[in-house]
Swiss-Prot record:
Organism domain of life: Archaea
Family: Belongs to the class-II aminoacyl-tRNA synthetase family.
Compartment(s) of residence: Cytoplasm
Organism per entry: Sulfolobus acidocaldarius (strain ATCC 33909 / DSM 639 / JCM 8929 / NBRC 15157 / NCIMB 11770)
Gene giving rise to this polypeptide: hisS
Catalytic activity: tRNA(His) + L-histidine + ATP = L-histidyl-tRNA(His) + AMP + diphosphate + H(+)
Phylogenetic classification of the source organism: Archaea, Thermoproteota, Thermoprotei, Sulfolobales, Sulfolobaceae
Protein name: Histidine--tRNA ligase
């Protein structure tokens, strides 16, 4: 074992674990590209102030922050949304709205490492900028559901949803500053409700927030929404608009077959959310595996014009934890080509065959192991290969190859001109 190990909270990925991560990211890319989103790359190292302005209390405490050789305070990005907003402000404001962007990349947070929580991890996310419509909210949340459907997880996941605009309205009426609001939401997010309620001197506010936090239902129930409206009306709050948004979005999502859970006590740790918020939960893990929300003030905070926006980020490694097995029909086929004699002609034919395989999106590997054929068969079965191709003296003389299909336990001798058709038909 090497004396050098990955830094605590970070890890190496290879084999099946890496295959799951790549499967998630490739599936994500396919779905979002088909939905009209364009990819953006941003640096891992950014100006510290980009994140310290509005990323939220918890994230600011867990950032990797340091000074570079020019004495600038910089940070490893703890999330990617602020970077996307920076790109938009610098280079994309002139483009037609709404603007649909996506990203895939590593982020860093100095959390205490535990199952499902790493200090370096990957996020795949989208941002839709320039629309305040509830249609945009529905597009983004249903897109998230579609991604998990494509990953084979739709039947297991539930999307938890709330409208943080309800809390913002109450806090604004109570005269609570934005900075105080961020702290209160952080306390509620961490389950420290009693500490949050201590910030209020008016018992009416305490009673209403206590009621909201307790309200949750697994599907859209009109009687519970009516109960919410009646309760809110007692306190003379104008929350009808925010409640109606939550009701409309939930109703359409249910019509689309999205499994949702409305939870009025659910808030997210990012300080910039202003409207609908959501996260993906899975019964096999105790933490969310994806989440997002509406952030209509962030562009203005960074110096731009008012630009409504909504987005989400998928925790790639967290999602990988709940994928038991990559769909077999989405895994690429693998074939090993084994020259049985060491001649120029056998090697030339092997390389030509490998090129045919790769052209057809089949993984082709030249055998370099000098062991008996029986051991090779066992090895390639254990490694998950679908077939092996034998090229010996007889095959060269007859201008053919021998294919052993390992799953079907079938063997075929095929003329060279028929190789492509036989492989495609038997491996599809």
């Amino acid at each position: 074992m090497s004396e050098f190990e990955p830094i605590r909270g970070m890890k190496d990925y290879y084999g099946e674990e890496l295959n799951k991560i790549k499967f998630i990211e490739e599936t994500f890319r396919t779905v979002v590209l088909n939905s009209g989103y364009q990819e953006v790359y941003t640096p891992i190292v950014e100006d510290f102030k980009l994140f310290s302005l509005k990323s939220g209390e918890e994230i600011r405490k867990t950032m990797y922050v340091f000074k570079d050789k020019a004495d600038r305070e910089v940070a490893l990005r703890p999330e990617i949304t602020p970077s996307i907003v920076r790109v938009y402000l610098n280079s994309m404001q002139h483009l037609p709205k709404p603007l649909r962007l996506f990203y895939v990349g590593q982020v860093y947070r100095y959390d205490e490492p535990q199952f499902g929580r790493y200090r370096e991890f990957r996020q795949a996310g989208v941002e839709l900028l320039g629309s305040s419509s509830s249609f945009a909210d529905i597009e983004v949340i249903s897109l998230l559901n579609e991604i998990y459907d494509s990953l084979g997880l739709k039947d297991k996941i539930i999307i938890k949803i709330n409208n943080i605009g309800i809390y913002r309205e109450i806090f604004n009426k109570a005269g609570i500053t934005e900075e105080q609001q961020e702290h209160l939401l952080h306390l509620i997010d961490k389950g420290k409700v009693d500490d949050a309620l201590k910030e209020f001197t008016d018992n009416n506010y305490k009673d209403l927030i206590t009621y909201l936090i307790s309200l949750k239902f697994d599907k859209l129930e009109s009687d519970k929404l009516e109960s919410l409206r009646r309760e809110v009306s007692k306190y003379n709050f104008n929350l009808e608009g925010e409640i109606n948004k939550l009701s409309f979005i939930s109703e359409v999502l249910e019509d689309l077959g999205v499994k949702i859970k409305i939870d009025l006590g659910f808030v997210r740790g990012l300080a910039y959310y202003t409207g609908v918020i959501f996260e993906v939960i899975h019964p096999d893990v105790s933490f969310s595996i994806a989440g997002g929300g509406r952030y209509d003030n962030l562009v203005r905070l960074y110096g731009g014009a008012d630009t409504p926006a909504i987005g989400f980020a998928i925790g790639v490694e967290r999602t990988a934890l709940v994928i038991n097995k990559i769909k077999s029909d989405l895994q690429r086929k693998k074939i090993a080509v084994i020259p049985l004699i060491s001649t120029k002609d056998s090697l030339s034919l092997a390389i030509r065959l490998l090129n045919i395989l790769r052209k057809n999106n089949i993984i082709g590997v030249l055998n370099l192991k000098d062991v008996p054929l029986s051991k090779l068969m066992t090895y390639y079965v254990e490694e998950g290969y679908n077939a092996i191709v034998l090229i010996g003296k007889k095959e060269l003389e007859e201008n053919s190859i021998t294919i052993k299909f390992l799953e079907k336990r079938e063997q075929k001798t095929v003329k060279l001109e028929k190789i492509e058709d036989v492989l495609i038909n038997n491996l599809s």
